[in-house]
């Protein structure tokens, strides 16, 4: 082989080696690029994963906040309802206590009324004997003293004669035909009626003009 041919062969070999080196460099660069891309993709995936976790945590927190707000509102409504019921209960008890205090003497006063009737019938009896008059005067004093004590405890007589008949206060037992009274007026009281403040203990028994 001539020197020229040998030189050509050497040149071709050098070219091939250089080509291979260039190819290797390209492959290395591509490999590095692919590695960089993989790392970038991995980084993006990691970022997306972190954002997804953050979104889930945020949604979970929002849900818990809403649940706590609902629980707080429910508890507030229950408290307000219980408070209102308790206030109504207190007012009812206070009213009942006031009523009981006002009408606590009702039973005793009702039991005493027949005795008052008997005393008043005794006072209507007439007599000329001095001892009788003295006794009657004593009964009169007892009667007046008893009425004062009863009135101090809220007992009131129901006015009847000359008044318009009121079924809430009067009990009509006889019809009358008296020109001195208007129709529907009480012409005579047959038995006194009494009330304790605004509560009727016993209605008046009366005659009513027709």
Swiss-Prot record:
Pfam families with a match to the protein in the record: GrpE
Gene3D superfamilies per UniProt: 3.90.20.20, Head domain of nucleotide exchange factor GrpE
Comp. bias (Basic and acidic residues): 61-71
Superkingdom of source: Bacteria
Biased composition (Polar residues): 24-35
NCBIfam families listed in its UniProt record: PRK14140.1 (NF010738)
Family recorded in the similarity comment: Belongs to the GrpE family.
HAMAP family noted in UniProt: GrpE
Complexes and interactors: Homodimer.
Protein known as: Protein GrpE
Source organism of this protein record: Staphylococcus epidermidis (strain ATCC 35984 / DSM 28319 / BCRC 17069 / CCUG 31568 / BM 3577 / RP62A)
Gene, per the UniProt record: grpE
């Amino acid at each position: 082989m001539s020197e020229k041919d040998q030189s050509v062969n050497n040149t071709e070999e050098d070219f091939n080696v250089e080509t291979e080196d260039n190819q290797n460099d390209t492959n290395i660069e591509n490999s590095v690029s692919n590695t960089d891309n993989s790392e970038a993709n991995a980084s993006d995936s990691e970022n997306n994963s972190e954002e997804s976790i953050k979104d889930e945590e945020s949604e979970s927190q929002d849900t818990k906040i809403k649940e706590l707000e609902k629980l707080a509102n429910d508890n507030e409504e229950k408290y307000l309802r219980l408070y209102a019921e308790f206030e109504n209960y207190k007012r009812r008890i206070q009213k009942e206590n006031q009523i009981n205090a006002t009408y606590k003497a009702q039973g005793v006063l009702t039991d005493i009324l027949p005795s008052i009737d008997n005393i008043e019938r005794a006072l209507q009896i007439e007599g000329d004997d001095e001892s009788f008059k003295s006794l009657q005067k004593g009964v009169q004093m007892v009667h007046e003293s008893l009425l004062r004590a009863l009135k101090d405890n809220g007992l009131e007589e129901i006015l009847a004669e000359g008044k318009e008949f009121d079924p809430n206060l009067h009990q009509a037992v006889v019809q009358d035909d008296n020109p001195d009274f208007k129709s529907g007026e009480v012409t005579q009281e047959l038995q006194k009626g009494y009330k304790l403040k605004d509560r009727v203990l016993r209605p008046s028994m009366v005659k009513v003009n027709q």
